[in-house]
Structure formats: structure tokens, C-alpha cells
Design a protein with these regions (language model features):
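Short coil/linker segments at helix-helix boundaries
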Residues: 78-91, 171-216
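Short coil/turn linking the two alpha-helices of tandem helical-hairpin repeats
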Residues: 137-139, 166, 171-180, 241-244
Length: 244
């Protein structure tokens, strides 16, 4: 199911997400003076403007992140109206908003800002993975499919992309196989030609969808010892033997 696919993808990177969060909190503690904490979004954004004008990009990004937490609407408006989109810091600020909205589960806004970031860094794998996840959460599985395929062109062993594509093609194959079987069972006295057509249909499903699922899931096992991927590969192997 879609929910199972979503959970699978979430589980695959939750540890990395936790570590990134801890690193981020530690960095904020080191970079921000105590006076920053507890300020309003407008106060923080005023400091962001000052930091940007002084060329202190790292400090500006840190303040911008705090501003997003203090008031996301004001911070987003600041991004659209006060940030030079051609500057080096602009995509970093877009990424701050993308991550913030993702954490707030505002997937439409998160998707918007990941796309904004990717305009400047179209081959950034972590951003592409996050963008694909947002596409999936917004119900755009076909778009997520294309984005994950792009991820694998850049990083063939990417775990999340291989998990998603492996599960996607396996579930698609199961759906196609079920329809073939149901249609064949409706025939009360199948002829040899009808049986041959049925077997050819199964063979096509295996060669295409099951075959793709197998390739992606085998890659998953090369990177991560996933029990679920192993079980699915066993099912595919069993069907392969039945078709021979």
C-alpha cells in the first residue's frame, strides 16, 4: 500500500535525520549568541539583513532558521521580497524553509522550496531525495518515480531511491499479475491460444515490472540488510521458477 511505501522510506533514513538534527542544534548553539534566542521573527530578520549586507552568510542562515521557527509566514515573505535570488546564499535560505516546512508536515510548501533550491543545485542528491519524498506525500507518485530515477543516475546505490523503486515496481507487478489471473479465470473453457496468451502476459509482467523490482531490491541488499527486501526477492524468485 502507499502507506507501507511511505513508512519504508521514512524508516530507511530516520537515523540520519536524527543525527542531522543533533548536529544542527549543536551548530546553532555555537553560532548564535544567547541574545538571539527568544526574539521575534521580525527582530531576527532585521539581523539577517544586517548579516547579509556584511557578508556574514553563515550567521545569516543561522538567524534565518531561527526566524522560520519564530514566524514562518514572515520569514517566507522575507525570502521572496528581500533576498537576492542570484546570490550564493539564496539556495541555502530556500533549503532552510524547505526543511522547516517538511518538519511541519506542510508538504506543499516544502516541495516548493526544494524545487527552488534545486533550480540552483539540480544534481544535489539529498535535496532530490527530499523532493521525491514530498512528491510522494502529495500523492504524485509518477513524479516521485522520475525524481528517484534521476537520483539513481547520480548515485546508483542510493538506499531510499532503490527502496522506493523496488517497492513501486513490485506492487505494480502484483497488480498486473492479479488482473491477468482474474481475467483468465473468467474463461470457463480456455483454448490453448488463450492459455498461451495468459502465460505470455505473465512472462511480460515478470520481465518488466518484476524484473525491475528485482534489480532495485538486490541493490538495496548490497547497501543495507533489509529483511523486507529479502522477503520480496524470495517471492519474486519463487514466481520466476513457476514460470519456467
Amino acid at each position: 500500500s502507499r502507506r507501507q511505501r511511505q513508512m519504508c522510506i521514512r524508516d530507511s533514513y530516520i537515523y540520519t535525520l536524527k543525527m542531522k538534527t543533533l548536529t544542527l542544534l549543536f551548530s546553532l548553539f555555537l553560532m548564535c549568541p544567547l541574545s538571539v534566542w527568544g526574539q521575534s521573527a521580525d527582530e531576527l530578520l532585521s539581523k539577517v539583513s544586517d548579516a547579509l549586507s556584511e557578508g556574514k552568510d553563515d550567521y545569516a542562515v543561522s538567524l534565518f532558521r531561527q526566524a522560520a521557527n519564530a514566524g514562518e509566514d514572515r520569514t517566507e515573505m522575507f525570502y521572496w521580497t528581500n533576498v537576492d535570488k542570484s546570490s550564493e546564499v539564496a539556495p541555502r535560505l530556500a533549503d532552510v524553509l524547505a526543511v522547516h516546512y517538511k518538519e511541519m508536515r506542510n508538504y506543499d510548501k516544502a516541495y516548493l522550496f526544494y524545487k527552488e533550491f534545486l533550480q540552483r543545485h539540480p544534481e544535489d542528491v539529498p535535496a532530490l531525495v527530499s523532493c521525491a519524498e514530498m512528491e510522494m506525500m502529495r500523492g504524485k507518485e509518477k513524479d516521485a518515480l522520475k525524481t528517484y530515477e534521476k537520483v539513481l543516475m547520480l548515485d546508483a546505490d542510493n538506499l531510499q531511491a532503490n527502496i522506493f523503486l523496488g517497492n513501486y515496481y513490485y506492487l505494480q507487478a502484483e497488480k498486473d499479475k492479479k488482473k491477468l489471473e482474474e481475467d483468465y479465470k473468467k474463461i470457463t473453457s480456455p483454448t490453448r491460444m488463450q492459455y498461451a496468451r495468459y502465460r505470455n502476459g505473465l512472462s511480460d509482467v515478470f520481465t518488466n515490472s518484476y524484473g525491475k523490482a528485482k534489480a532495485y531490491l538486490q541493490r538495496v541488499l548490497q547497501v543495507f540488510p533489509s529483511m523486507e527486501a529479502g522477503n520480496t526477492l524470495e517471492k519474486i524468485k519463487k514466481m520466476e521458477l513457476e514460470l519456467k
